Design a protein with these regions (language model features):
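Active-site loop segments of alpha/beta catalytic cores
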Residues: 1-31, 44, 55, 84-318
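N-terminal capping/small domains of soluble enzymes
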Residues: 15-80
């Protein structure tokens, strides 16, 4: 425990990035949606950070949703989606600014950043988006580019405020969405990479989240291996088989995060059951590792489960 007291959470998170020196401390963090906005969201994030003892402040992107003034009924309508100015993101920037002020001296501030695809499926139902991509990918791409440029405005503003990094998400390539590689590359990966390469140029600590909330992936390695991110938060399965954290580290050749099922013992069990599940992950975890879940945990997950699991990670190698 001496190392924990001697080093700040910021320092301990940075040590995970050093692939040449396995750290003796395993950071940990779990995320949930709080269902509130504004000052209530500031308080909810801070209360959760301190109650769980997690190693960084991860800010949700729940302050606003992309809504279109003109309906998107055909692929050609995607070109009507405007490029949103920085001012449109003010509710999210307000939350970020206040959390930076309150917690940055203590821990890294990591802002969730939805992908262009994730924002697009706020504007229309996901099945409409997928249908439009299959009908006319080039037309849809015009709207995806505008959404990407909008998100770049948010990234630039967040970087100026002093955010340490982003929790960068990708979706859309699932077997039940846009699995076709050519369509995926044109309408999803092209814009993910455009956005996330800019992110990596502006802030130092980015976590790439490959989200399987909507479905599973085939061709996982070739689809995602070249995505940017200092750390990769991976699903628990890919290509119809389990994906261990050690195997994920071999694929991405950088630190990985995850290991626990978001709706498993961490959300629904007792503290002892949550710790037992975490222990199995820690036994085979790669050297450079952050314990977490495959996505957000249940909003009613017991704080005692989360804190017990995080404490176990902190003490596992010390």
């Amino acid at each position: 425990m001496a190392q924990k007291s001697a080093k700040s959470k910021r320092d301990l998170m940075m040590k995970v990035l050093d692939m040449g020196k396995p750290p003796q401390y395993i950071p940990a963090g779990f995320f949930m949606h709080f269902g509130v906005t504004g000052d209530a969201a500031v308080k909810a994030h801070l209360d959760y950070f301190h109650a769980t003892g997690m190693d960084f402040v991860k800010i949700q992107f729940d302050e606003q949703r992309l809504e279109t003034k003109e309906p998107v009924k055909t692929p050609r309508d995607w070109a009507k989606i405007p490029i949103l100015p920085e001012s449109w993101f003010e509710p999210s920037l307000y939350l970020l600014k206040n959390l930076i002020k309150a917690a940055k001296p203590e821990a890294l501030i990591i802002q969730t950043l939805y992908s262009p695809y994730q924002m697009a499926k706020q504007a229309v139902p996901w099945n409409v988006l997928v249908e439009h991509v299959n009908q006319d990918a080039e037309a849809v791409s015009r709207g995806m580019e505008n959404i990407t440029l909008s998100l770049m405005n948010f990234v630039q503003a967040a970087a100026r405020l002093g955010v340490d990094g982003f929790y960068m998400c990708t979706q859309g390539g699932e077997t039940n969405r846009i699995a076709d590689r050519a369509l995926f590359n044109r309408t999803i990966k092209n814009f993910d990479m455009m956005l996330y390469k800019q992110v990596t140029e502006r802030v130092p600590y980015n976590i790439m989240h490959v989200c399987d909330y909507d479905g599973s992936y085939q061709g996982f390695t070739s689809r995602f291996q070249d995505y940017p991110g200092r750390v990769v938060n991976v699903p628990l399965s890919a290509d119809a088989q389990p994906l261990s954290m050690r195997r994920a580290a071999e694929i991405f050749k950088r630190p990985v995060m995850g290991g626990l099922e978001r709706l498993g013992a961490i959300s629904n069990g007792t503290p002892d059951q949550a710790k037992a599940a975490a222990l199995e992950v820690l036994k085979t975890a790669p050297a450079n590792f952050i314990l977490g879940a495959d996505c957000t945990v249940n909003a009613k997950a017991p704080i005692g489960n989360l804190r017990a699991t995080i404490n176990l990670a902190h003490e596992y190698r010390t």
